[in-house]
Regions:
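SAM cofactor-binding core of SAM-dependent methyltransferases
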Residues: 1-62, 108-110
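Hydrophobic packing residues within well-ordered alpha-helices of enzyme cores
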Residues: 42-43, 65, 88-92
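Conserved acidic-Pro-Pro-aromatic motif
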Residues: 12-21, 26-29, 49, 72-79, ...
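Conserved amphipathic alpha-helix within the SDR
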Residues: 64-70
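A Trp-anchored, charged/polar loop motif used as the substrate-binding/catalytic surface
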Residues: 62-63, 82
């Protein structure tokens, strides 16, 4: 979800896409959703997955998943939809849809930087409370945080990586032996 380029023009259909790797190198299938019509028209013929152009501030994520016949057990979901991030997260029916692996972009570093520059300490504490709340929701649905506050190319923290209890139990030894999240995630995603 949020398979676009983050507002950056690109001729590369995988530019800034968490899911493109799995499609291109693991032969995974799925659905890519983004509100950017420029993204949609630039990648709809170059991606193997189904590409959907929808504004997730306007349309409920569960409707889109249902309309596109997504299974109730989804191997991987990446939620990176900027302004619609928290709406999608709160709308998502965790009772119906289960995920083996979930990445949720939070861009906490940008949010806190903005709070420091433009907002009060009270606003910063409100943001941190919301951030903790989404982690509590995922934990309450049985997800385990694999890596918190993952940094991306010197930016960070940008996202958290979560796994289902089953995946966590299956790969706990890899996780505990490695601080290299890319190595462990590569094993998990095979």
């Amino acid at each position: 979800i949020g398979a676009g380029t983050g507002g950056l023009p690109s001729s590369n259909p995988g530019f800034y896409s968490n899911t493109y790797f799995f499609e291109a190198f693991r032969s995974w299938t799925g659905i890519a959703i983004d509100y950017d019509s420029d993204w949609y028209f630039s990648v709809k013929n170059s991606r193997n997955c189904k590409c959907v152009c929808e504004d997730l501030l306007e349309k409920n994520i569960n409707e889109i998943l249902s309309e596109n016949e997504c299974p109730e057990l989804i191997d991987y979901i990446s939620i990176d939809v900027d302004d619609a991030q928290w709406k999608v997260f709160h709308d998502l029916n965790f009772s119906k849809y289960k995920f083996n692996v979930l990445t949720l972009e939070h861009n906490l570093f940008q949010t806190l930087e903005s709070c420091t520059q433009n907002r009060s300490e009270e606003h910063k504490q409100k943001v941190l409370k919301e951030y903790d709340a989404y982690r509590e929701v995922l934990s309450s649905h049985g997800y385990k945080i694999l890596w918190a506050d993952v940094n991306l190319d010197g930016y960070g923290p940008v996202e958290d990586w979560w796994v289902s209890q089953e995946i966590f139990d299956r790969y706990a030894d890899i996780y505990s032996e490695s601080n290299n999240f890319k190595e462990a995630f590569n094993v998990i995603s095979r």
